[in-house]
Amino acid sequence: MSIRWKSISAALAVAVATLGVAACSNSSDDKNEITVYNAQHESLTKEWVEAFTKETGIKVTLRQGGDTDLGNQLVAEGAASPADVFLTENSPAMALVENAGLFADVDKQTLDQVPAQFRPSTGKWTGIAARSTVFVYNKDKVAADQLPASLLDLAQPQWKGRWGAGVSGADFQAIVAGLLALKGEDATRAWLKGMKDNATAFPNNVATMKAVNSGQPDGGVIYHYYWYRDQANTKESSNNTALHYFKNQDPGAFVSISGGGVLKSSKKQESAQKFLAFIAGKAGQEILRDGDSMEYPVASDTAANPALPPLASLQAPAVDPSKLDAKKVTALMTEAGLL
């Protein structure tokens, strides 16, 4: 029996109207005020901004949007962009802007704060947070010995109609980008075909988790922190579920890197570099750890929230985040009928 796909196409254009105004105005010439195009969680970034401004006196204006929308806007604006800094939840949008030649080199002192596996080899931007791919499952529907050993197993017939994901979102598309980088185009195309046959599309990670919690479907592919945040609060959306971590450098153990970079066109390079250094450094990473985002800090001197399994224990595959190809992922998912 084929799975009925929920309507999700409208989600791709949500931020367009609100972002359009950005291209119509220029940043202030004041060196003590910068503009950040922010696709990272707004609440976390506001905490960073408040602490940074208190420490440095530099004011920060946030323009909020999604990874893909803001990345495409920066490419369209080019050297005329009012943005000084770009922050994302996932790496593909950072790679998009990097490949357009729009990022300045990140200061070496900033890069040195972050281990090499959490930033691109090019040095054009840096990781600022990390999130792990997980399989959330309903404990009443899936026994431990039935859990998939690999993300690739979810394309097999035994998982038909039994799992879902937030297909249209940048989060899931980053996971597919990781699969593409690790296994290549043919394997990714085959897996997406199996997904089309087997899975239910949901608007996002939260909707996926809620559906799994209700038992329809049995499981879903999400990022870890949605589950941990709900567990730390009401547990209403996750009480009937548990997390399964893929191991052994499987594509399902992919760790997505949230990125930050300074625009080459910025006339406020010093202030922009200071902001990036702050959020990637100890002070900014402790704000992330001690807040309610439940994402992983990536600075070498900052441990994760103790509720989370250590990042080093996740057996994530090695993926250079600058190699994640958002355009190819979109093409492959469209070809498979997922977008």
Task: List each language-model region with its residue ranges.
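C-terminal motif of bacterial Sec signal peptides marking the signal peptidase cleavage site
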Residues: 19-23
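Bacterial signal peptide processing site
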Residues: 25-27
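Extracytoplasmic ligand-binding site segments that recognize negatively charged/polar headgroups
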Residues: 39-46, 68-69, 75, 81-217, ...
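A ligand-binding cleft/hinge motif common to bilobed small-molecule-binding domains
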Residues: 92-96, 219-240
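Periplasmic-binding protein-like
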Residues: 131, 159-167, 192-195, 201-202, 237-264, 278-300
